[in-house]
Amino acid sequence: MAHKKGVGSSRNGRESHSKRLGVKLFGGQAAIAGNIIVRQRGTQHHPGENVGIGKDHTLFALTDGVVTFRKGRQDRSFVSVLPVAEAKA
């Protein structure tokens, strides 16, 4: 029997860095073309009018306007960017 504990590697230290996911621009906020609206894993939110989707499912504004969220079929969330003139009407 060993009288001293064998020196092994630590069992801690493998927590991953946070990925900073989530909604970056909320409903009613102004968006400039190219602004990131949502960072997500998979399509929790789907692209609507004037919104593009990146290969990592990031939603971004294609035009300047106001961000809106709406529910579609089967409770699917859509994100759109409405031009300012349209949003006021």
UniProtKB/Swiss-Prot annotation:
NCBIfam families: L27 (TIGR00062). The gene is rpmA. Pfam families: Ribosomal_L27. GO terms for biological process: translation. Signal peptide: none annotated. InterPro entries: Ribosomal_bL27, Ribosomal_bL27_CS. HAMAP family: Ribosomal_bL27. It comes from Cytophaga hutchinsonii (strain ATCC 33406 / DSM 1761 / CIP 103989 / NBRC 15051 / NCIMB 9469 / D465). The keyword Ribonucleoprotein applies. PROSITE patterns: RIBOSOMAL_L27 (PS00831). One of its GO terms (cellular component) is cytosolic large ribosomal subunit. This is Large ribosomal subunit protein bL27. Keywords: Ribonucleoprotein, Ribosomal protein. One of its GO terms (molecular function) is structural constituent of ribosome. Belongs to the bacterial ribosomal protein bL27 family. PANTHER family: LARGE RIBOSOMAL SUBUNIT PROTEIN BL27M, RIBOSOMAL PROTEIN L27.
